[in-house]
Design a protein with these regions (language model features):
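Short acidic-aromatic active-site loops that bind/stabilize oxyanions
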Residues: 99-107, 129-132, 273, 277-293, ...
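Short beta-strand-loop/turn "lid" adjacent to the catalytic site in phosphate-handling enzymes
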Residues: 56, 60-114, 140-141
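Conserved hydrophobic/aromatic pocket- or pore-lining residues that grip, position, or stack substrates
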Residues: 195, 295, 318
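Phosphate/ATP-binding catalytic cores across multiple sugar-kinase/actin-like superfamilies
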Residues: 285-311
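Short glycine-rich phosphate-binding loop at a beta-alpha junction
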Residues: 60-72, 128-130, 307-318, 416
């Protein structure tokens, strides 16, 4: 009998998702936001995503052996709740809560999950729910999905789970051993989030913007060392300035922030607007530099010995999406290979919790080779969506789709590209992407004008053929998920200028054909036409919206933007007034 495990996340009131393992194979995984069309799907449960997973596998709720959740009760006999109470002494109500009712959030979440499962048709008397500690779920999503056979160092850095904020451990023969955890408020992810808010962005999305702004600034102009220190193996955040609650918060128009008025006294008013200017670019640079410095020190201290032994590191948690840190980690002489869980944020804990329980029940899970784990749609589905759509799309079926789309791109046109199964995790990787020819001058600006409206200092990223990577980024380190940045070779900076960031790096996806043949063939066609087997690749969505899931989502986005071309499977939709490329047929 197959072991069927449904993993559900959403414990921290954002990024609910569902993942389904059957006999160690990840058959489906998706984020709730894509179905409900609400970014991060805050305060929701993974109802639609779980429904999709069951449908994709063709199973009923009664076929599920166990439901794994990435949030667990924390004992009063450990350090976590006492640490929280001691560090938050200035908010006695919250401190006492941690001691007296420290698992209230767990109980509330579990009840919501049970309700969600009942809505899906699970029998409440028969549901087996297995809680996995939040940071163990992150750790499992990194280690168990890495495919590493030897002893593996495991790192988890995020905002916070139940109480833990940082996890150090190792994996050996499928078993995870915890070496050390830090607890709220001592959170590097929390500090980065607080500075993100101060720089005028929102936590959860803004961190990427801070990281993108950092290369424009000079980290030596402002010393941020007072904000956090790592000494004698302990990370301490200065809660005079950041990671604050209650009365210590800076407030503006009734909204409380994660930093204190003291930070404003020191650095001046919080940033407003869309411009990357002084002193804020320097603050971004200083925050990124402090984050890298402390992370690398902590890795040294807790994981250095294991890395010297085998050189394998598995990394997850929201901060694992900091691609600049990852570049520094790969550059360490003691790191042979770094695996970053592509859905490192809380969405990935659905995979992690399920993988953890699968291992605990004696069924190892397979290596995560790709993230095409969401819904797919046929040409017939696409045509039906076009027929129903009020925008009355002009569509036609084309042949040799990859080659023909490359021809449209070479003329400088961005194309909305909708092929195969939707990606799991925050990165578009050639399933739901907007693509452009990176040697075509101004294509990034056109994407911004037509749809993205991004701040100009935010980079666009390349996907490339595995045959191109050795020349362009000069590494043989695997990079299938856009979780690392690499130095771009000088010659390639001029060949594909549209995908190189201010600091000469690119966040690259290096693609092997077997995982996405169509996307690969499109880049092969670009290589034939331009000499470069590289595509500009950004996610298929409008600013502030989740990535597109269905053909109807794609059409809504297409007609709500100035994009001219949309290809869904073999169905090409062209905006009125745009060249139709009739010759392609």
């Amino acid at each position: 009998v197959a072991l069927t495990i449904l993993g559900l996340s959403g414990a921290l009131s954002h990024d609910p998702s569902a993942a389904l393992y059957i006999d160690g194979k990840l058959v489906a995984a998706a984020e709730e936001e894509r179905f409900v069309r609400d970014k991060h799907a805050k305060n929701r449960m993974p109802y639609e995503s779980a429904k999709f997973c069951l449908e994709q596998a063709g199973i009923k709720p009664s076929d599920v052996d166990v439901v794994a959740i990435p949030f667990a009760p924390i004992s009063l006999f450990g350090k976590a709740r006492w640490h929280y109470a001691k560090r938050y002494w200035y908010a006695p109500d919250r401190a006492l809560d941690a001691i007296l009712m420290g698992n209230r959030r767990y109980k509330r979440y579990r009840n919501k999950i049970v309700f969600c499962l009942e809505q899906l048709g699970f029998d409440p008397k028969k549901i087996k729910i297995e809680p996995v500690e939040h940071h163990l779920a992150h750790a499992s999503s990194a280690y168990h999905c890495s495919g590493f056979k030897e002893k593996t160092a495991i790192l988890g850095i995020d905002g916070k789970g139940e109480y833990a904020t940082t996890f150090f451990g190792y994996g050996e023969n499928g078993k995870i051993t915890k070496l050390k955890e830090f607890f709220d408020p001592d959170s590097l992810g929390g500090l980065y989030g607080a500075i993100t808010e101060f720089l005028g962005f929102e936590m959860l999305d803004g961190e990427f913007k801070v990281m993108g702004m950092a290369p424009y600034g000079d980290a030596s102009k402002y010393d941020f060392s007072r904000l956090a220190s790592f000494e004698n193996g302990e990370l301490v955040i200065n809660t005079e300035y950041a990671n604050v609650i209650g009365l210590r918060r800076y407030k503006e128009n009734g909204k409380g922030f994660y930093f204190s008025p003291k930070l404003i006294e020191w650095l001046g008013p919080k940033r407003e607007g869309d411009i990357a200017d002084e002193p804020y670019i320097h603050y971004a640079a200083s925050m990124q530099a402090l984050f890298e410095k402390l992370s690398l020190q902590m890795i040294d201290y807790y994981l250095g010995d294991i890395l010297k032994e085998t050189g394998k590191l598995a990394f997850a948690g929201g901060c694992a999406l900091n691609v600049k840190l990852n570049q520094k980690i790969i550059a360490r002489p003691d790191v042979k290979e770094l695996f970053v869980q592509p859905a490192s944020g809380d969405a990935g804990t659905a995979v992690g919790a399920a993988a953890y329980v699968s291992h605990a029940r004696g069924v190892p899970v397979e290596k995560m080779e790709h993230v095409y784990l969401g819904p797919a749609y046929s040409n017939e589905d696409v045509i039906a969506a076009c027929a129903r759509h009020p925008g009355n799309p002009a569509w036609r079926k084309i042949n040799n789709t990859p080659e023909n789309i490359a021809k449209i791109m070479v003329d400088g046109n961005p194309v909305a590209w909708f092929q195969g199964r939707m990606e799991f995790g925050p990165r578009a990787l050639g399933g739901r992407s907007i693509i452009g020819c990176p040697s075509s001058s101004g294509v990034a600006d056109r994407i911004n004008e037509q749809i993205k409206f991004r701040e100009r200092w935010r980079p666009f990223c390349p996907s490339m053929l595995d045959t191109v990577a050795p020349q362009m980024i000069k590494v043989d380190h695997p990079a299938p998920f856009m979780t690392f940045t690499f130095e771009v070779a000088e010659e390639w900076k001029t060949r594909v200028p549209e995908v190189v960031h201010e600091d000469g790096t690119s966040r690259a996806q290096v693609l092997k054909r077997e995982y996405n043949p169509r996307y690969y063939d499109m880049m092969k066609a670009l290589e034939v036409l331009t000499g470069n087997g590289v595509s500009l690749n950004t996610s298929l969505n409008r600013r502030g919206e989740p990535m597109v899931c269905s053909p109807t989502d794609a059409l809504n986005m297409f007609f709500g933007s100035d994009l001219q071309y949309l290809i869904m499977e073999d169905i090409l939709v062209v905006k009125e007034g745009a060249p139709t490329y009739e010759s392609l047929d």
